[in-house]
């Protein structure tokens, strides 16, 4: 008789263990994170040299971004 009780307890334990193992783990979405902003100090230190790729004038050491490159002169031919 105690064999049946032990077998029933083990079956319930195995069923519960399967439920725990099969539950999904919630993932943290990376889309919700905001990118870190550079402080004015690091913006000044990390200015790009002439010829480096850029997106706007504030990224270049010469403050001239032309055709996605840091430029030395305003009108580039």
Swiss-Prot record:
Gene responsible for this protein: LEAP2
Instruction: Say if the entry is tagged with keyword Signal.
Output: yes
Q: Which residues form a coiled coil?
A: none
Question: What species does this protein belong to?
Answer: Homo sapiens (Human)
* Listed name of the protein: Liver-expressed antimicrobial peptide 2
User: What is the residue range of the signal peptide feature?
Assistant: 1-22
Q: Which cysteines are joined by disulfide bonds?
A: 54-65, 60-70
Propeptide residue range(s)? 23-37
Domain of life assignment: Eukaryota
Q: What family is this protein classified in?
A: Belongs to the LEAP2 family.
- Cite the entry's keywords alphabetically: Antibiotic, Antimicrobial, Cleavage on pair of basic residues, Disulfide bond, Secreted, Signal
Q: Which GO terms describe its biological process?
A: defense response to bacterium
Location relative to the cell: Secreted
* Function of the molecule: Has an antimicrobial activity.
Looking up Pfam families in the UniProt record yields: LEAP-2
Q: May I have one GO cellular component term?
A: extracellular region
């Amino acid at each position: 008789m105690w064999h049946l009780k032990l077998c029933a307890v083990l079956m319930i334990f195995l069923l519960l263990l399967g439920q725990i193992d099969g539950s999904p783990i919630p993932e943290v979405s990376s889309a919700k994170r905001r990118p870190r902003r550079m402080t004015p100090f690091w913006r000044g230190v990390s200015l790009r040299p002439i010829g480096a790729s850029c997106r706007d004038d504030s990224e270049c050491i010469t403050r001239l971004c032309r055709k996605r490159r840091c430029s030395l002169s305003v009108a580039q031919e």
